[in-house]
Amino acid sequence: MAIPITVLDCDLLLYGRGHRTLDRFKLDDVTDEYLMSMYGFPRQFIYFLVELLGASLSRPTQRSRAISPETQILAALGFYTSGSFQTRMGDAIGISQASMSRCVANVTEALVERASQFIHFPVDEAAVQSLKDEFYGLAGMPGVIGVADCIHVAIKAPNAEDLSYVNRKGLHSLNCLVVCDIRGALMTVETSWPGSLQDCAVLQRSSLTSQFETGMPKDSWLLGDSSFFLRSWLLTPLPIPETAAEYRYNRAHSATHSVIERTLQTLCCRFRCLDGSKGALQYSPEKCSHIILACCVLHNISLDHGMDVWSSPVPGPIDQPPEGEDEHMESLDLEADRIRQELILTHFS
């Protein structure tokens, strides 16, 4: 059960004691356009978050006034979507930057506690078949129930001695594994892997591998790019296609896998704290991991509320560390190779 958290107002000396909860900012006092421009989400979505997280963000206190759940959520959304603790953001809702930082921490933890509620694979056969049908309708790739990729998110250096977070560009990052469906809804998110790990190593160590190797629906698989090794449950493109059927397979694979690429671009465009445009996340790796996951939870909640995942303008490919030559090598999984060749022969010849 989530433990309710109270954020005490750091500006108490400026405003004195009085009512137990501070409500300097009222949603009803501003326009929908203002909320979208400042916080990135519409009014009804924010009201839903207040209802969802309110119990975790509030608790009666006799000692001082607590910042309301509504204000805490606005502070967090402002940070997630802008990537910085701007003075104007705190001024808009009437709190200091120090209070904003605490609000972000508490809202982040409240969202992380609910991650499994909003990020998960479907379990019933009808839902799995629906995934297959939708992906097949996109580019003719059969049996696909999700598309996988990794994305690096820049973080500050944990300490001078720890090189595990240094990626191939010489920058500190977390390498995050993500799987989505055709709508861009996230079904698996792992955000704690250090940036020095290659994508194939992240996948090997992930819970996703144990989940799919212990059991998955028959004739079902994920699609991954050439940074992953071919597996019996994860199909990759052919490094050197030779026949017409192999070229058709690669084209269908690329068109289908582009869903996760667009989803990650949109995620970083909506949540600018992830794209590095305002600098690396200035927290410990664990807190950075939680912030990334919180943004992913918000992404899925927004889809559940009818917001279009593709509505945000996407500037272009995400700047990521280069792939190593070894990442284009095929694995020696003979069973996986047999499955892929059989698929090509059956569906693309």
Curated annotation (Swiss-Prot):
Q: What keywords is this UniProt entry annotated with?
A: Cytoplasm, Hydrolase, Metal-binding, Nuclease, Nucleus
**Pfam family of the protein (one):** DDE_Tnp_4
GO MF, one term, reads: metal ion binding
Q: Name one GO cellular component term.
A: cytosol
Q: In which tissues is it expressed?
A: Detected in adult brain, eye, nerve tissue and lung. Detected in embryo.
| Cofactor(s) demanded | a divalent metal cation
Query: Where on this chain does a divalent metal cation bind?
Result: 149, 199, 225, 261
Q: For this protein, what is the EC number?
A: 3.1.-.-
The record's subcellular location field reads:
Nucleus; Cytoplasm
Broad class of where this protein is predominantly found: nucleus
Q: Which residues form the DDE Tnp4 domain?
A: 149-300
Q: How does it assemble?
A: Interacts with NAIF1.
Q: To which protein family does this belong?
A: Belongs to the HARBI1 family.
- Function recorded in the entry: Transposase-derived protein that may have nuclease activity (Potential). Does not have transposase activity.
What name has this protein been given in UniProt? Putative nuclease HARBI1
The UniProt gene name for this protein comes to Harbi1
